Amino acid sequence: MGLSSTTWFVIAVIIVLLGVGLLFVDRKQQGGSAAVKDRRRWAALRGWEFLDTDPVLPSRWRYGTIHQGGPGVAKNLISGEVPLPDGSRQAYVFDHEQAGRVTSVLAAIQSQTQLNAAVELRLPTAPVPDDVALEYLEPVGERYAFVSDADAVRPLLTRRLARAADAVGDDVELLWAEESWVLATAPVESSADRLQELLADLAEVAIALEQGQNAHT
């Protein structure tokens, strides 16, 4: 007994859906591969180091998305120095994999001073931190400051910091500073050019924090 026309129609629909699904996966993989090649090329042009994976680096920090989803693993990591007028700063950019999936691109740049407390600067669209060690302090430009020590951080929240934080852009909902690092999370699809701009913006945030700290020491 042959299959009915309805059955053949259902089979055809399933085949089409499977084909579309495979095409989507293939394009997604190609896009990911292109992004990795782009980052490799970027690292090579600047003499930076590229690593496929680093399971240890993210555990260096504890606030921001590190607290939210755990240290996870650094994928497609590039590391090197960002030249600035007052000296070069160590920097990292990597795909942040948490619980088996990449949740964001994390960029980090080293500061020349050590902060006595942590500060997270979140856009209004970002979720409120669930870290009990942080408390809301005040607005900083377009962002809200959540800090681990209000007395230590308040003098650092200058107009220059507000301008630097606002310049980071609306695609970066969360940036934070802890110890001698300034970090930010960017969307997974961020281009190499955008990440280069982000590192420059984070350098300005780091300088603003340094100046605020030096003015009160």
Tell me the role of every PLM-derived stretch.
Residues I15-V16, Q30, P55-T65:
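Membrane-cytosol interface segments
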